[in-house]
C-alpha cells in the first residue's frame, strides 16, 4: 500500500492508483471533463490538475499515480487559478448557446462553469465552424467540441471501428471523421456510444420530434406509437423519476395525453420476429449442407450496418427477417388498418427505440411493404420522447397508469426479454424448442 496526504487527509491506496482515484476513496472530488477510466486518461482538458508538494508544475490527477509520502492539494489558490483559466480557454472555443442545446442541464462543461462561477470570458470567442449533413441520424457540431477525445477512444477501443480521429494542427486541431471521409462514407454503425460519452452537445442524435408534433396536430393523421421493451426501463431517468414511478403504464398515459391515437407494445412484433427467425433457423438446420452457420439475428440495425461495413462476408448469414419495429409498422399499415377501417396512408407510425441506428433503418427505401409508404414514419430515441413530455408540460407522476391498446399490445415472455442482453438468442432457443417439442422448455 502507498501512503500519502490529500488535502490534509491521510490516504492509503494500492500502488499504481491514480491521484484522482485515491482522492475519491476519501470523498474528495476532483473535477474532470475528458477523463474516462481505462479508456481516456490523457489529461487533455487540464481541469483535473492538482498541486504536489515539491513539484513546481501542476499535474493532471487522472494520469499520474500516487507515490509514498506524496502531499497533494486539490484546491489550492494555484490550482483554482489554473483550473479556471483552462476552463475559460475551453469556453472561448465553445458555442455557449446553452438555451438551445439538447444537453443543457446535463452538460459537464456547463456544470463545471457554474461550479467555478465562470459567467464572463476574458478571451475573444473563436469558433471552428464545420459543415455537417443535418439529415444524417448522428449530428456533430464542431463549435461545441472541446477536443476531449472521448469519442475517438470509445469508438476505437470499445466498438473497434475508429470512425473518429484528430484533424488539422495546432490551434486548428479538431475531431472529425477519420481519413477526411464524410460520415456517410465511414463505417459508422450509429451505435450512439460517442453521443453517450460526449461531455457536451457536440454529438447528438437528429431530433425528429417536430415531425411527430406536426402529425399530432394534423386532424387527417392517425398517430400510432409503438414502445420498445428497453425503453420502459429508461424513459424516466432524464425526467428525474424514480424507477417505481416511471412505469410503462405512465408512459402510455403521457403519450395519450399528447394526443396519440393508439399506443402499442413492440413486444408483440418481437414475438413475430422471433417466430420468423426461429422458423428460419430450423429450416437451415434441416438443410445444413446448403447453409453456412452460425445464423445471426437481423433485428438490430446497428449490428446489420456493422456486418455490411466491416464483415461483409457474413451478410448471407444474417436472418432475412425484418426487425420488430419494422414488422410492427408493416402490420399496423396492413392488418390493423384493415381491422379498424383506416386508410393506411393516413396512419403515422412512430417507434420509440433506444437506438440511433433505428433512424437509419426507417429511411431504408425497401421498408415499405404494407402500402408503399414507409412502414415506420419516424423513430424517436428515449431522450426525444422525454423532451416531448417536458415540452407538453406533462407531470407523469400525476398520471394514472394506462394499458396498451389491443390487439397489438400483448406479448409473451420471449418478446419482453428482447430488451436484455442475450434476450434475442434465448427467445429464439425457447421458440425453436416449442416448435420442435410442442411444449415450453
Annotated model-derived regions:
Residues 1-7:
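Eukaryote-biased recognition of intrinsically disordered, low-complexity regulatory segments
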Residues 46-190, 196, 203-218, 222:
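Fe-S ferredoxin-like electron-transfer domains
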Amino acid at each position: 500500500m502507498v501512503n500519502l496526504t490529500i488535502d490534509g487527509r491521510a490516504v492509503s491506496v494500492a500502488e499504481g492508483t491514480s491521484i484522482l482515484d485515491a482522492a475519491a476513496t476519501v470523498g474528495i472530488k476532483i473535477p474532470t471533463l475528458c477523463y474516462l477510466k481505462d479508456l481516456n486518461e490523457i489529461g487533455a482538458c487540464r481541469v483535473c490538475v492538482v498541486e504536489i508538494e515539491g513539484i513546481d508544475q501542476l499535474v493532471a490527477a487522472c494520469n499520474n499515480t500516487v507515490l509514498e509520502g506524496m502531499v497533494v492539494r486539490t484546491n489550492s489558490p494555484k490550482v483554482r487559478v489554473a483550473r479556471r483559466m483552462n476552463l475559460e480557454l475551453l469556453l472561448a472555443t465553445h458555442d455557449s448557446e446553452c438555451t438551445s442545446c439538447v444537453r443543457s442541464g446535463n452538460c459537464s462543461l456547463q456544470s463545471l462553469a457554474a461550479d467555478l462561477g465562470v459567467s464572463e470570458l476574458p478571451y475573444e470567442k473563436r469558433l471552428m465552424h464545420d459543415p455537417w449533413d443535418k439529415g444524417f441520424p448522428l449530428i456533430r457540431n464542431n463549435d461545441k467540441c472541446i477536443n476531449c477525445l472521448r469519442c475517438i477512444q470509445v469508438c476505437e477501443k470499445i466498438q473497434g471501428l475508429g470512425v473518429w480521429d484528430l484533424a488539422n494542427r495546432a490551434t486548428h486541431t479538431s475531431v472529425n471523421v477519420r481519413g477526411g471521409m464524410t460520415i456517410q462514407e465511414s463505417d459508422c454503425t450509429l451505435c450512439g456510444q460517442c453521443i453517450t460519452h460526449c461531455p457536451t452537445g457536440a454529438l447528438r442524435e437528429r431530433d425528429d420530434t417536430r415531425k411527430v408534433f406536426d402529425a399530432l396536430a394534423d386532424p387527417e393523421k392517425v398517430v400510432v406509437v409503438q414502445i420498445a421493451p428497453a425503453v420502459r426501463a429508461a424513459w424516466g431517468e432524464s425526467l428525474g423519476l424514480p424507477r417505481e414511478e416511471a412505469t410503462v403504464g405512465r408512459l402510455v398515459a403521457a403519450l395519450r395525453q399528447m394526443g396519440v391515437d393508439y399506443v402499442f407494445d413492440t413486444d408483440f412484433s418481437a414475438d413475430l420476429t422471433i417466430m420468423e427467425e426461429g422458423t428460419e433457423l430450423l429450416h437451415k438446420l434441416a438443410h445444413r449442407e446448403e447453409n453456412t452457420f452460425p445464423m445471426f439475428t437481423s433485428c438490430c440495425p446497428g449490428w446489420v450496418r456493422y456486418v455490411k461495413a466491416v464483415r461483409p462476408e457474413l451478410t448471407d448469414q444474417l436472418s432475412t427477417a425484418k426487425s420488430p419495429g419494422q414488422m410492427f409498422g408493416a402490420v399496423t399499415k396492413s392488418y390493423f388498418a384493415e381491422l379498424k377501417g383506416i386508410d393506411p396512408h393516413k396512419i403515422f407510425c412512430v417507434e420509440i427505440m433506444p437506438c440511433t441506428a433505428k433512424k437509419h433503418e426507417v429511411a431504408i427505401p425497401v421498408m415499405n411493404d404494407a402500402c408503399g409508404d414507409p412502414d415506420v414514419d419516424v423513430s424517436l430515441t428515449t431522450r426525444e420522447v422525454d423532451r416531448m413530455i417536458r415540452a407538453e408540460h406533462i407531470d407523469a407522476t400525476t398520471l394514472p397508469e394506462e394499458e396498451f391498446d389491443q390487439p397489438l399490445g400483448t406479448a409473451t415472455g420471449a418478446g419482453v426479454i428482447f430488451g436484455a442482453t442475450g434476450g434475442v438468442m434465448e427467445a429464439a432457443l425457447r421458440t425453436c424448442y416449442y416448435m420442435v417439442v410442442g411444449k415450453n422448455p
